Swiss-Prot record:
Biological role: Produces ATP from ADP in the presence of a proton gradient across the membrane.
Keyword Cell membrane: yes
Species in which this protein is naturally found: Micrococcus luteus (strain ATCC 4698 / DSM 20030 / JCM 1464 / CCM 169 / CCUG 5858 / IAM 1056 / NBRC 3333 / NCIMB 9278 / NCTC 2665 / VKM Ac-2230)
Membrane topology: Peripheral membrane protein
Annotated Gene Ontology cellular component terms: plasma membrane; proton-transporting ATP synthase complex
CDD domains: F1-ATPase_delta
Annotated keywords: ATP synthesis, Cell membrane, CF(1), Hydrogen ion transport, Ion transport, Membrane, Transport
Entry's family note: Belongs to the ATPase epsilon chain family.
Pfam families for this protein: ATP-synt_DE_N
Name this polypeptide is given: ATP synthase epsilon chain
Keyword Disulfide bond belongs to the record: no
InterPro entries (alphabetical): ATP_synth_F1_dsu/esu, ATP_synth_F1_dsu/esu_N, ATPsynth_dsu/esu_N
Highest classification ranks of the organism: Bacteria, Bacillati, Actinomycetota, Actinomycetes, Micrococcales
GO molecular function: ATP binding; proton-transporting ATP synthase activity, rotational mechanism
Length: 91
């Protein structure tokens, strides 16, 4: 089964990395969803929740603010100005 190699980083540190089956995030142009095999792209990250569906069936959420979202050959890098694990309801 194809998978994504995902990395979420902020200016200060690495937030999370691992294998995923899907990733969704907010860009300045709206929500985007990424599955394995997605075409390469680069987007400006908006403020909001990043949701990673891990290959073991779990979910990782992070709050991200500003930065970039890139996809290339099943590698997803979310380079946020600031980010932290957890959803908005936990804040």
């Amino acid at each position: 089964m194809a998978e994504l190699n995902v990395e979420i980083v902020s200016e200060e540190r690495s937030i999370w990395s691992g294998a995923a089956s899907a990733v969704s995030a907010r860009t300045v142009n709206g929500e985007i969803g990424i599955l394995p095999g997605h075409t390469p792209m680069l987007a400006v990250l908006g403020d909001g929740e990043v949701v990673v569906r891990t290959t073991d069936g779990g979910t990782v959420t992070a709050q991200a603010h500003g930065g970039f979202f890139s996809v290339d050959h099943d590698r997803v890098v979310i380079a946020a100005t600031s980010a932290r694990l957890g959803d908005a309801a936990a804040a």
